[in-house]
Regions:
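Elongated, mostly alpha-helical coiled-coil "stalk/stator" tethers of large membrane protein machines
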Residues: 1-181
C-alpha cells in the first residue's frame, strides 16, 4: 500500500472523529506540537521506529511529545487505534496529514517569510496587511526566519506560491538578462 495513503486515511478518519467530539481545534494544536517534536528531536522518530521499544512506551513518548494529557481523549484514542493496527510508525505522517486537512477545512495558510535581516514589528505588520488584502477571510500562520545570503529583501511563501523580493534574486535576473544579450 502507498506509504502516503495510510497516514492520509487515518488523518481523515481522525478529523471526522474530532469533528464529532468538537475537538478539532484542540487536536490541531496537539498535532502541531507532535510534528514539531518530531522535527526537533530525531531520537523520537528513532524510538517510535525501534521494534525493541514496546508499544506502551512508544505511546507514552507520543503523548509527551504532543504535550497531551489524560484529558485529551481524542488523541489518546487515536494512539490506541494506531497501536492496535500496528501503525505507530506513521504517527508523524498522520500528524502532518491532519494539519493539512484542518488547514484546508478552515482556510488556514502557512506563510513562511525569510528575510536578509530580522524584520521589525512595523515591517511584519505591513507584510501581513498586504497578505490579508490578497486572501480576505483567510487565517495565516506566520513563521519568520533570516538568511543573510539573500543580501537584502525577503521571500514570502504561501502554500505553493512564492514571492521573491530579494536583492539576490534581482542580481540573478540581471545576470540572466545580460548573458542573454
Amino acid at each position: 500500500m502507498n506509504e502516503g495513503l495510510i497516514p492520509k486515511r487515518y488523518a481523515k478518519a481522525l478529523y471526522k472523529f474530532a469533528l464529532e467530539k468538537g475537538e478539532t481545534k484542540r487536536l490541531y494544536a496537539t498535532m502541531a506540537t507532535l510534528a514539531r517534536s518530531f522535527d526537533d528531536n530525531a531520537q523520537l522518530a528513532a524510538a517510535v521506529a525501534n521494534p525493541f521499544v514496546d508499544d506502551s512506551r512508544k505511546t507514552s513518548l507520543l503523548m509527551t511529545a504532543a504535550g497531551a494529557d489524560a484529558s485529551d481523549t481524542v488523541y489518546a484514542d487515536f494512539l490506541k487505534l494506531l497501536t492496535q493496527n500496528r501503525r505507530l510508525g506513521y504517527a508523524r505522517e498522520c500528524a502532518l496529514a491532519y494539519l493539512d486537512i484542518y488547514r484546508h477545512e478552515n482556510r488556514i495558510y502557512p506563510v513562511a517569510i525569510v528575510s536578509a535581516r530580522p524584520l521589525d514589528a512595523d515591517e511584519k505588520a505591513r507584510i501581513e496587511a498586504l497578505l490579508a488584502k490578497h486572501l480576505p477571510g483567510a487565517t495565516m500562520e506566520y513563521s519568520y526566519s533570516t538568511d543573510p545570503a539573500l543580501i537584502g529583501g525577503f521571500t514570502v511563501t504561501v502554500g505553493s506560491e512564492r514571492l521573491d523580493a530579494t536583492v539576490a534574486n534581482e542580481l540573478k535576473q540581471l545576470s540572466l538578462k545580460l548573458l542573454a544579450k
